[in-house]
């Protein structure tokens, strides 16, 4: 065979062709992607928050401004003191099915069992002034009657008007809640804790608690707030404590202060997703009281505690009217209390 017809085999194979060059990565590309990702997450969170706020605020039942014309026409500027009228009614129609309805009687309609003015100085203090429902007042177009009658005959607007005329205190916002709604709000926070020095009961309202710090559920909290025949167990027997409606307003303030403490507590963060929509779903408010305003006031109140809350019931005394009915009327001390409320000063 002729070997010259075959090409010679090289001693070493030729080197492989060079790999294609990769484009150099631009510095900072990962950081830019991370920033864009965070911006996207923040945008989603903002829109989710806006949606949540809108959804929550949409649950509030509003009173048309044309039906609540007596509110103070000049609203305070942001950060300025603001006055609320907070009322609770005895409307039985929304009571939860598992509550004992026998404790609420047979009254049809609704009356104001709680009338409380709140003066909020953002970030500084809150003042509460309870008004007795039997306070003798002059109701426009209806003559002399008890304060809570103004709500029965003329609704929220006439009540606001009567209170402003009798006290000289401007009311900027109005909030109403009924028994059932108040109970649901309490339950949304896991109950409200009240300290009882002695066992207490009220056979009419349904209150029945042992001594010590007791966490009341919504139904029992309402029973405590409604109690007018409050009894304590001492020295082997039950004894009435007296005080009637005035003592009851003090118990109502107890609950308000304790609820405030619980909402302001860091531990309440776990309950807020339930509390906020429950609160909104169970109140009626004027159109000007936006959830944004409530949130701003709530944020300003987070730095406060019960020592920053002054509370009092308007000083009154018993009085028999010319119509033969029982009323209460302001004492000489009432003027100084009202003046302190208006000024945001400590009560005398």
Placement of each model-derived feature along the sequence:
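Entry/capping segment at the start of metal-dependent catalytic domains
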Residues: 25-123
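C-terminal solvent-exposed extensions
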Residues: 94-96, 135, 216, 284-348
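Amphipathic, coiled-coil-like alpha-helical scaffolding segments used for oligomerization/assembly
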Residues: 148-210
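Extracytoplasmic
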Residues: 79-82, 110-115, 123-126, 131, ...
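Second-shell loop/turn segments in exported
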Residues: 103-106, 145-153, 168-173, 211, ...
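Extracytoplasmic/secreted envelope proteins and their assembly/folding machinery
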Residues: 112-115, 144, 156-164, 179-183, ...
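Terminal targeting segments of Actinobacterial cell-envelope proteins
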Residues: 1-34
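Flexible, polar/acidic helix-loop-strand segments at domain edges
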Residues: 187-270, 348
């Amino acid at each position: 065979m002729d070997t010259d017809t075959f090409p010679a085999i090289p001693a070493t194979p030729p080197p492989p062709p060079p790999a294609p060059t990769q484009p150099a990565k631009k510095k900072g590309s990962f950081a830019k992607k991370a920033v864009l990702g965070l911006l996207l997450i923040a945008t989603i969170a903002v829109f989710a928050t806006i949606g949540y706020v809108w959804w929550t605020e949409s649950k509030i039942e509003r009173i048309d401004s044309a039906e609540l014309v007596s509110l103070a026409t000049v609203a305070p500027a942001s950060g300025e003191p603001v006055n609320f009228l907070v009322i609770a009614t005895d409307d039985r129609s929304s009571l939860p099915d598992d509550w004992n309805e026998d404790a609420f009687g047979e009254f049809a309609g609704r009356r104001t069992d709680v009338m409380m003015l709140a003066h909020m100085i953002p970030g500084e203090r809150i003042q509460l002034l309870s008004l007795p429902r039997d306070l003798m007042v002059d109701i426009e177009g209806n003559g002399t009657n008890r304060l809570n009658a103004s709500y029965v005959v003329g609704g929220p607007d006439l009540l606001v008007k009567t209170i402003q005329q009798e006290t000289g205190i401007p009311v900027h916002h109005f909030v109403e809640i009924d028994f059932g709604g108040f109970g649901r709000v309490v339950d949304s926070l896991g109950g409200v804790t009240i300290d009882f020095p002695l066992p207490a009961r009220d056979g009419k309202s349904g209150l029945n608690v042992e001594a010590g710090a007791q966490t009341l559920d919504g139904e029992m909290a309402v029973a405590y707030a409604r109690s007018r025949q409050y009894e304590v167990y001492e020295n082997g027997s039950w004894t009435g404590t007296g005080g009637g409606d005035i003592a009851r307003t003090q118990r109502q303030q107890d609950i308000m202060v304790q609820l405030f403490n619980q909402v302001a507590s860091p531990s309440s963060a776990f309950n807020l997703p339930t509390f906020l929509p429950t609160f909104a779903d169970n109140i009626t408010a004027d159109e000007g009281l936006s959830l944004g305003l409530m949130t701003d006031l709530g944020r300003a109140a987070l730095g406060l505690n019960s020592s920053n809350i002054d509370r009092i019931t308007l000083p009154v005394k018993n009085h028999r009217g010319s119509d033969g009915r029982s009323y209460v009327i302001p004492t000489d001390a009432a003027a100084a209390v009202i003046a302190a409320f208006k000024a945001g000063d400590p009560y005398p």
